[in-house]
Amino acid sequence: ANFWDAFQLIPVSRGFWHAEHWFDVFPVRHHVPGTAYGLCLRGAFFYSGDTRPIPEVVAQYADGTMPLVHDCDLHGNPSHTGLPDLLREYPAEIIRQMLVYHYASAADGTALAAAGLRVAKAGDRLRLPKPQPAAQAHAASAGAI
């Protein structure tokens, strides 16, 4: 079987509709520009994808209620955020809304939690808030990024 037979690839620009919801898509900071993107269902979740800190992007989406799921390990690299980067680049009120993922080991997850971060663990489930009404989310995305 061909690996690509399992996927239907559809190019998108600033977002896409799925199940009557508007999903924003945005470029993130990765070692090769244009190779990594984030995703947001406004009101429900923000997902950073693989990225260096992107406080200017997060600020456009953070609403104080939805989880901001963000790439973070103990040490950063050209494609990923490290703990010092996260603490330096984001204000405390944004960090409190974050759920970090993409760390190297369970021990690293424990260290991130000890630093005061909420850490996603294998098998966790995250209850998401109800997303914004689709028309409102779509209209808001027109002014984003």
Language-model segment annotations:
Residues 5-7, 21, 43, 65-66, ...:
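A structural micro-motif
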Residues 53-138, 142-144:
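Cap/insert and terminal regions of metallo-dependent hydrolase folds
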